[in-house]
Amino acid sequence: MRHVRLIAALVATVLAANAMAGHHEKPEHNALIIQADFEGMVMAGVAKSVSKKLEVFNVRPLISLYDIRAASETLAYNAQTWPEGTVFVSVVDPGVGTARKSVVLETKNGLYFVSPDNGTLSGVADAYGISAVREIDETVNRRPNTEWAHTFHGRDVYSYTGARLAAGVISFEQVGPLLEPEVIQLEISAGTYEERVFEGQVAGGVDRLGNIYFNIDRELFERDKPEYGDIYEIAITNRERIVWEGAMPYAKSFGAVAVGENLLFINSSGLLSIAINQGNFAEANGIGYGADWRISARKRR
C-alpha cells in the first residue's frame, strides 16, 4: 500500500511538472497574415509548403492595384489586435524587380512585417514603433529554384520568408543583415484646426462601404468641443475644385440618422469620417482619396 501511495505521489509530481512546462511553453507556430493587391492563394500555398501546421489568413477585400497608401493604412489597422509574434506579409509592389529593398520590420510590441520597403511599412512604424529592421538575405531566404524569377517576390521571397519566420524555421536574426531602424515614409500631412475650421486630406482612404476618412484624429477634433447633433458645414475638393459641399450632423454611429442620410463621425481607428447610413458616400458623390483630396469642416454656430 505504501508503494502504491509512493507511485501515485511520483505520478502526480510528474504530471504537475509537465503541466507547468506546458503552461510556459511557447507555441510552435505563430499566425501568418497575407495582404496583397492581387489574389494571394498562391502565396498561402507557399506558406503551407513550409509547414502544414501554419495558420494562414488572407486579408479581404484585396488592396486596390499599386495602392501603397491603402496597403500602409490597412496593415496598421489590421495589426492592432494580433498577439506578439504574429507575422504579416504585405505585397503591394509596383517596383518589383528594382533596387527597392525587401525587409522584415520588428515592431516594439513584437510583431513582424515582411514587405518591400516602398512606403507600405510607414503606417506600422508610426503606430507601433520600430524595434529593428533586417534586409532579407535572398541567398538563403528565397524559395528554391526561383532565382531566375524577378516579377513575383510575393511568392518567392516574402511569403516564403514570412512562413519560415512564423513557423520557427528561422529566427528574426536569420532573416538577413541588420539595417538602420527606419523605413521609407509616405508623405501624409497632419490635419489642422485654426480659427474654428478643420482642414485635412482624405489620406486614410475609402473603405469598402464607401465611408471616407481624413487625417483629422479624435484628439484634434475634440478641440472644437463637439456634441452629438452639432451640424458641420463640409466642403470636399480635388485640386481646389469643389466636388461636394453641404452640411451634416456629428453623430455617434450610423443609426443615429435616418437611412440615406449623411453623418460625420469618429471611426474605429479614431479618425474623422463621413458616411451615408446604409449607403456609399464615396460612390454616390465621386470621392477619391490622396493628397489632392481635401476637406474643410466648420461647426455651424
What are these regions (language model features)?
Residues 1-7:
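Bacterial N-terminal signal peptides that target proteins for export
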Residues 37, 161, 277:
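A residue-level signal for conserved active-site and pocket-lining positions in enzyme catalytic cores
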Residues 144-228:
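Anionic-ligand-binding alpha/beta catalytic cores of soluble enzymes and soluble regulatory domains
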Residues 22-23:
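Boundary of Sec targeting at the N-terminus
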Residues 29-31, 51-55, 67-73, 81-92, ...:
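Active-site histidine-anchored catalytic micro-motif
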Residues 27-62:
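N-terminal glycine-rich anion-binding loop in soluble enzyme alpha/beta folds
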Residues 213-286:
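A conserved acidic, glycine/proline-rich C-terminal tail/linker
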Residues 7-18:
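Bacterial N-terminal signal peptides
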